[in-house]
């Protein structure tokens, strides 16, 4: 029966489940101390790094980063959506899943059962049909044939055509005002802010549907056929599409071959499709963003090796360096990354069509550089290691980056190579990394989650998502050459601006220095509360320190209030209340990173953060009242509040019963 699954039932189901039973029915577990271990079912490995904790009712893989509760495991392992996983686990537990009708006051449930999915799927079908039969399709067909694409590849990637005109899709799908509003939310329509006129976002373009890991269409890319700009146009950010997390072609690559050994990262849709046309069905592309740590995390869950294939110009080399930075924190032992730069004026699309698959593969094998070689070669462009000053500068640049590598063996080998170049012992390198200035192009904290992307998303944290059925649907120094052997540096004068450039674009831009990760206090408080929900009961009133403009503070308040209203909920039950949302992803990422770590003085740190947030909100309120008093007359209530703030004796400013 269709309908919403009550949150109370989901809480009860999770409470009844034993994650060891759930996982062991699908994966052979071995008892190791108080936990259980196995080879991870989500990526290839020979040494077990997958751990299940019966105490925490949580699983985590130290190799690929997969983790979550029993419900999440079944979703990922069995390839089920949320309601199907609930049904499966309820059936195993002998429970019947109740259903209830949605209430008017409920907010839209996204992205678990978002109405955007069927709408985007319908739009994709419209574009595909237009490519087959629209009167204006000839330009699109000629373009695709001119790129050497077969009908089979066009079908596999779902290619389509957005006809010229302002309202083709609008007329086809926008039957009423409400439907048009959903189309705007999905990025299919644009609404003029002044006139209110609505029109198709994609017009006269070859269309590339973008799919998530389950094959659901979440966005589109369009390549213009005429002279309009931009040449390539992506869907905007939506509740179901986040550019910094998705990779074009990953779903198609995995669908074609579930046992991939390496994935090629290229720069555009046509590069992915051109390689697929030539039989290389293992390429992906980012969606108008730099390669992020989230991208690498996803890629290394699928394959042990990543090849970055970029243009050899300055932009391509800058993109490669940023990809290298994102790769470092994901380099567990057993993983590898390579870099291939193409001849000037060429891209994978043009090159593979010109020289063929065999020659292109030979180019990869002969000219790609291991990450370590590329790393030291590029730093050698910035710091001339033939002088003592250059050696010191190179050590300063390299040390903090090397310490980002989690794989102990690779990290030590990188230290050893830096010693061969600079003469510094590995211990000195480690010490130098700890002293590095806190300026970096790398994320300031937890590399496993894109917190900046989270900050642009504004759901209602107080709204507990309900769930219904949804479509199923990455003395003389030596210079490493391409083979990795040693050879002396050239006697030619060092030219900092020689071809290839420095790893970053602006000459006056600070070189990359990576500090030890520092987590913002609010995220630390969220993490602590997840592992110790009973702390919420000691907070008297969370609402007074909520900063309406700060997303993490809002989530902290919502989590405290949820734990206070339901004091018996476990950590996993709390996280499940935000399942399928961006805040749920954040909570899970926080829980995964520290679920086996025990810290001292957690309670004191938690209430120190609460006190700090209270003080910050008090200062903000004081500033707002003072500003208003200079512009207009305050009300009696505002005057009383201002006096209280000035005396630092505002009611309810003590957040805990103990006065913390």
From Swiss-Prot:
Compositional bias of kind Polar residues = 428-442
- Name the GO cellular-component terms: cytoplasm; DNA-directed RNA polymerase complex; primosome complex
Query: What InterPro entries does the annotation carry?
Result: DNA_helicase_N/primase_C, DNA_primase_core_N_sf, DNA_primase_DnaB-bd, DNA_primase_DnaG, DNA_primase_DnaG_DnaB-bd_dom, DNA_primase_Znf_CHC2, DnaG_bac, DNAG_N
Q: Give residue ranges for domain Toprim.
A: 261-343
Instruction: Give the record's GO biological process terms.
Output: DNA replication, synthesis of primer
Instruction: Establish whether keyword Nucleotidyltransferase is in the entry.
Output: yes
Where does the record place the region Disordered? 94-115, 425-449, 476-519
- Segments of skewed composition (Basic and acidic residues): 97-110, 488-498
Copy out the cofactor comment: Binds 1 zinc ion per monomer. Binds two Mg(2+) per subunit.
Enzyme Commission code: 2.7.7.101
Top enzyme category: transferase
Binding residues for Mg(2+) 1: 267, 311
Spell out the reaction equation it catalyses.
ssDNA + n NTP = ssDNA/pppN(pN)n-1 hybrid + (n-1) diphosphate
Q: Kindly state the subunit structure of this protein.
A: Monomer. Interacts with DnaB.
Family affiliation: Belongs to the DnaG primase family.
Domain notes for this protein = Contains an N-terminal zinc-binding domain, a central core domain that contains the primase activity, and a C-terminal DnaB-binding domain.
Full protein name = DNA primase
Q: Which gene name does the record give?
A: dnaG
